[in-house]
Amino acid sequence: MKIGIVGCGFVGATAAYAMVMRGVGRKLVMVDVNRARARAEAADISHAVPFAHALEVIAGEYEELEGASVVLVAAGVGQKPGETRLQLLERNAAIFKEVIPQVLRHAGDAVLLVASNPVDVLTHLAASIAGELGIPSSRVVGSGTTLDTARFRSLLSSSLGIDPRHVHAYVLGEHGDSEVLGWSTVTVGGMPLDAFAHRKGASFPPGLIASIDHQVRHAAYEIISGKQATYYGIGSALANIVEVMVYDRRSILTVCTPLPEVEGVENVTIALPHLVGGRGVLETFPPALDHMEREALRNSARIVRNAIESINV
């Protein structure tokens, strides 16, 4: 199976490397406006193939995306220290208006996976462009809060001393400052968080809850402050999403895709738990949040909707 990657910066290249390590697909086609960068990244990653899985990794043009089942779009400028994801919008929206039509011209049957930030708004923009070509919005998916959700689960598991794969917790809304940690819906081993913590002799006092919230919400800023970019975590998250799509795993992931309504906010793209498979988003499962979380999710949806309107989508 062919997978396209458009944008060979830190995120796109790291996602490609993660796919090789996981053995996702059979062929990776890397496309970038900087052709020398695409060739160099493809060559470097291909040298890891003998130590991992037998994938063909090449640099190419948009034409070579034809027949791809998934195209990862990681094109755009990066987030600067102190810059919010929404502040990136104007610059990256202009890039998307050039890139997305070229991708769809050659890979119109593919699922688009958007990674560029602000991912919620750019996914909405990509879906709008795709819609003009008759492509359903369910086949345009953003990485959403998949990485934030992983951070949340990891911190909870550390506090409980268990494997994070057995913690079911979700971060919802914008992938950014207004995201919502769904504390009221957390379960561990089939039990509500408080009940499981009590059995373990642990607790989540307000101070610990606030600390976890801060760490999840501000992780990217702290990483960017120290090394100018984030890419290992999101690269791994993207490789996982692509694997789910390529092999039709039918996994519940907090990706983002255009939704008709969220908490009274219409026509908005934010992260909720979605059933994801070979043709993109198959179904949406809004969680049963408490009152404060619902208000926070409504606020997050409004923020993203306002950003969408700012680029006239």
UniProtKB/Swiss-Prot annotation:
Binding-site list for substrate: 79, 85, 117-120, 148-151, 230
Enzyme Commission number(s): 1.1.1.27
Q: How is its activity regulated?
A: Allosterically activated by fructose 1,6-bisphosphate (FBP).
Q: Does the keyword Ribonucleoprotein apply?
A: no
Catalysed reaction equations from the record = (S)-lactate + NAD(+) = pyruvate + NADH + H(+)
Keywords of this protein's UniProt record, alphabetized?
Answer: Allosteric enzyme, Cytoplasm, NAD, Oxidoreductase, Phosphoprotein
How would you classify this enzyme at the top EC level? oxidoreductase
From the Swiss-Prot or TrEMBL record, give the protein name: L-lactate dehydrogenase
In the record, Phosphotyrosine modifications are located at: 221
Q: Which Pfam families match?
A: Ldh_1_C, Ldh_1_N
List ligand-binding residues for NAD(+): 11, 32, 37, 62, 76-77, 115-117, 143
Chain sites annotated for binding beta-D-fructose 1,6-bisphosphate: 153, 168
